[in-house]
Structures are given as C-alpha cells and as structure tokens.
Amino acid sequence: MIVWLNGTHGAGKTTTSGLVQQLIPDSRVFDAEKVGETLMDIKPGLPGPGADNFQHWPPWRPLVVETARRVLDYAGGTLVVPMTVLVEQYWREISAGLAQHAIPVRHFVLHADQDTLRGRIAGDILGPNSPFRLQYLEPYAEAARTWLHAEAEVVDTTHLTPAEAALQIAEAVKG
C-alpha cells in the first residue's frame, strides 16, 4: 500500500510523513523527490521542460511508480510518500501506473489556508520566504479548486500540529 501525502509547500508533508511512518507498522518513507533529483543530476541536462520542475520530464512519473513497486516487492509493508503533485495528468499517470501493479493508494492532501501557508514558509528555518515554495501557492489553490480535493482525502492542517495530522491519517489508513 501507498499512503500519498500531497499538498503544497508549507502544508507539512515532510514532517507529517515521518510521524505517519511511526504510526503505521511495517512502513517506510519514500521521498519521490529523490527520483527527480537523480534526473536533475544527469549531465548534460535532459531536454525539454523540467529544468525548473523535474515533474515535467516524462521519465519522472514512471520511475516513481517503478521505484515504489520494486521497493514494495522487496520489502513489503506500506510506503508513505510525501510529494506534491499539482498537475492532474501527472497524478493520473502515477495513480494508473500503481493501479496496473495492483498497489492500493490512499491519497491525502494536507491543506491549509493561504495565510497559514505563507506564515509557515516565512518561518521555515531552512529557507524562510523561499521564492520556490511561494510560487506554488497559487497553482496549489487552482489544483485544489479544480481536481485535487475531489481526488483525495483532505486533511485541513490549518489548526493541527503535524502529530495531530499524522494521527488522523494513520487512523484513517488503519480503518
């Protein structure tokens, strides 16, 4: 099984994923961003769009699926995947690829209102007011309105700690 934690930057995916992993027996965190970082390390760089966002490179989506499948085949259990996917076509490719391998997916979106997200990004000790993180607030809002919230279980983190959000997700997964 895969527990996918979607949402924009500042929603708490990375922190929450580590806490979810502790609450779900036999689970591991798989950061699909590392697959993208590998693609970005190819020299000279890959052609086409993607230099600013590796998700635009067509190999990224099937490589995420294949990596997840191989890890689950090898280790079993559950993968917790903290990864923003705001392009509906990309989510469809990933979810269809996982379905082809009969891998069940619980798709959660960690949501917070725009003011809360901006405050979290401003207060991030690793990179306060990151332009990279801020540029995804509007695309997230658009995806949330048009498709994302309808495709996932929404966890509003506006007034939740990461531990509270993780508990809510783990309880939903465990049934």
Task: Walk through the language-model features, giving the residues of each.
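The conserved Walker
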Residues: 9
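Conserved phosphate-donor/acceptor-positioning beta-strand/loop module used by diverse small-molecule
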Residues: 99-121, 155
